[in-house]
Amino acid sequence: FSFHEMKSDLVLPNGARFYNDHTHPEYSTPECRRLLDVLAHDRAGERIAQRAAERRNHALGGPHVQLYKNNTDFHGHSYGCHDNYLVSRSIPFSSLTAGLLPFLVSRQIIAGAGKVGVEGQESGFVPGQYQLSQRADFMETDLSVDTMHNRPILNTRDEPHADREKYRRLHLIIGDANMCEY
């Protein structure tokens, strides 16, 4: 890839963002008010990424680019499917964490993408049994501002992208890639 291709960051006509996040493509849905809109934009992102891979393969003259919707490279690296919510600042952060942490941990039982094997940043990939979540091996703490090391279930970076006096950003980085809309 050229320097320009590695640093590309596009805002798409549907309001989504498509960019290179370190070594892999990342698609961020536009802001959505309804669950059905999130699902539609998630599926649109799959199609956009697939078309980009097809174009790249055509330009390279063969099937050099492979596309996977996952949360791990099976070499000890993980990337999350993030949720971001605009939340009223009048709700105490301690109330959010007390109510959300048990739900977020148990959500992986229902919505986890699953994988075979165990891995971590230090240990790499070890073949093994089936797990319900691809991301769980990499979560290390309940709350933290970090996203690359000491990964939290609930990220505390407060970037609301709105009126800071009224709102906070609830940034969840525990999620697995969505495989099913149900």
Predicted features by range, described:
Residues 90-96:
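Inter-helical turn/loop segments and adjacent helix faces that build the functional surface
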Residues 71-88:
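Histidine-centered divalent-metal-coordination microenvironment in nucleic-acid enzymes
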Residues 1-68, 77, 98-118, 124-131, ...:
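Terminal catalytic/cofactor-binding subdomain
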